[in-house]
Amino acid sequence: IRYCCHDPIFLKNRKGEILLLFAKFLDTEVNFTTWCNGRDELWMRKTQDNGRTWLPAVPAGIQSGHASNDSVLLPDGTIVFASTSTELPEYYFGAVQIYRSHDDGESWEKGALLTADDGNRIREPAICLRPDGRLLLFTRTCPGTAGWGTAGNRSLPSYRAESLDGGLTCC
């Protein structure tokens, strides 16, 4: 069986291995009519030779949302990435969950869970590591009632969050 996969991101661990994290629809090859309805989960593949060969895909052990942009590797070896979250029914695909790995991507712990207080939904986060050690996170937004956005929406604010502790908390 083939599966429809989407939203891939690359992660690099302290051993130099490259991980490919992606969302995989579990019940159909092509799922355009039911896009992003919670029936997908995050899977991962790993290469130890800079992409020449890849180990088989395995579940990443993360049951929430879609990653959208690449990760950061902290000086202590912790991998951090942010994902659009499906955990909160009132913010379904409208919140951001930060994930952290201390064992080169073998397992993940949850960090901060972010929402907007003004009724907008935040999604598709991008995260970067500043030279001073701060993590900055930027998100796309859309109105809380618009799903993934609607024609005619001209411009909404882009939200920004900052973490001083590697993504455990954000402000």
PLM feature spans:
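Asp-box/BNR beta-propeller blade signature and adjacent active/binding-site loops
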Residues: 1-171
